[in-house]
Amino acid sequence: MQQSRAALAERIAERRDGGDDPRALVGEMRRSVLLVPVADGGLWSVRSGGVRWICGFTDEAALARFALHHGPGDRPVEYAALLGARIVDEIVPALGEPAGLAVDIATADGSMFFPPVVGIVPEAVAVDGGGAGAGRRP
């Protein structure tokens, strides 16, 4: 499991450097177990640009960087370990609004956003798809 998360962080670095195949990056995200902070009975997310972003982290160090600025202070951050595929295939469609996945958002030069488009989320909820999500452009 840890190896899979490390592989995703490596693919993100390669992509940010201009290399790697974007499809391979999406595949690695889908196979990776991400740590997603839990708050108020749900997964921690932010809204930006008309999109709700579920925040996931590749390891506890990346989650800790996030918690320094957004955590509950003196309490540990609770999180769920979720497969990337489950996030984009099940959780995103259940939100009922344009939503994507933001990975390692507190890591300088190491974050990656997986937007609500065909090939990342199901076509029915993708903002560029032909389903119900097509009318919900951000």
Describe every region a protein language model picked out:
Residues 1-138:
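An interfacial alpha-helical scaffold signature
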